Amino acid sequence: MSAQTGTDLFKIADLFAYQVFDSRGFPTVACVVKLASGHTGEAMVPSGASTGEKEAIELRDGDPKAYFGKGVSQAVQNVNQTIAPKLIGLNATDQAAIDALMIQLDGTPNKAKLGANAILAVSLAVAKAAASAQKTSLFKYLANQVMGLNKTEFILTVPMLNVINGGAHADNNIDFQEFMIMPLGANSMHQALKMASETFHALQKLLKQRGLNTNKGDEGGFAPNLKLAEEALDLMVEAIKAAGYQPGSDIAIALDVAASEFYDDTTKRYVFKKGIKAKILDEKEWSLTTAQMIAYLKKLTEQYPIISIEDGLSEHDWEGMETLTKTLGQHIQIVGDDLYCTNPAIAEKGVAHKATNSILIKLNQIGTLTETIKAINIAKDANWSQVISHRSGETEDTTIADLAVAACTGQIKTGSMSRSERIAKYNRLLQIELELGNNAKYLGWNTFKNIKPQKA
């Protein structure tokens, strides 16, 4: 028998999927890829709660007698019976070809047949196996082999840490989904997370002093009942100061409004539903037109050290998003999430219309590593910032940390300073910083290339 060649060692020898659980206790898909060399890669996919309508389809069984319809046995079966036979024997380093083959096998525009959760699990596991076989870190493999960047120096990511949860991510009466802190005054990942941890615990102390609950939402942030966004922002500013930092200089604030969640398609108005249901808002006053919503967001940026606003308007309100970006985009990062759903074609439309100046990147919105990288590159070519993101239903998989560093996106949002599925990503970023040493750069305020932030 002849010895295996170097190329043969990268061939996929085995591939299988199985069911695991996400951070909300619902099933999700895991995949293991084994190569001829004996190296393996394993990936687990996340799941979102507030999902954009244009996202690739997360395949669920729909059987009400099993996991209330949220089982993933069909997605697992699709990997084991449909995808695996076609991929075994292929070279794991040919990521683009493998992803293209899975897209072809699915044959639908939104991966509805095999499921984006099935396809993504395989896509990520293949990359991890290939990195392992090349005896290199995943971020280096992605940067130099998959993206062809040939890099030795990397940009570490400024984290957006979700310290107050609302919207679809918490059982409280806050309509905005995420209130985040960005430690922009730090000079390293280690210092950034120190600042974030201290602010997080200062906020917890403040909430207790005010008699507000400190229960956590899906992403590890606190989920108190508050009357308005302003109350959450006041608490954040006070917590930043209590931790010994300067709001708007050391630490700035980022919002994920997730406005699609309270946009009424019939009336074309933004109805602050959770607050109204709790009878803390006047229904007439808090049913806002697009112009009123933009004015409200502008007012918030004038009153608080806000540097970034995600999904400030509905994913259906393209004209409004263009106006929002024209109004605030010179000094504020305007991020599109539901608007684009990490879809390269939709991202290109956004660039043409100047709908935002930044894009949120979620692997499971599009369903393959190759398409995700394409969306990142479209944003880079347009001089937009890119924010790599987790989902509210997460696992201990840390791929997004490696992807953020590999693509030098400069920003990541992956939850608060609690819940181990969130902390796992931050710990991975610390490992990467340690591995890179002097070849790692934390940009802080310089992460914003296309806006002129107004620092305090």
UniProtKB/Swiss-Prot annotation:
Cellular component terms (Gene Ontology): cell surface; cytosol; extracellular region; phosphopyruvate hydratase complex
Annotated residues for binding of (2R)-2-phosphoglycerate: 177, 362, 391-392, 413
SMART domains referenced in this protein's UniProt entry, alphabetically: Enolase_C (SM01192), Enolase_N (SM01193)
Pfam families documented for this protein: Enolase_C, Enolase_N
Cofactor binding, per record: Binds a second Mg(2+) ion via substrate during catalysis.
Catalytic residues identified in the record: 219 (proton donor), 362 (proton acceptor)
Subcellular location(s) of the protein: Cytoplasm; Secreted; Cell surface
Function: Catalyzes the reversible conversion of 2-phosphoglycerate (2-PG) into phosphoenolpyruvate (PEP). It is essential for the degradation of carbohydrates via glycolysis.
UniProt xrefs under NCBIfam families: eno
Family assignment from sequence similarity: Belongs to the enolase family.
Protein name per the record: Enolase
Organism placement in taxonomy: Bacteria, Bacillati, Mycoplasmatota, Mycoplasmoidales, Mycoplasmoidaceae
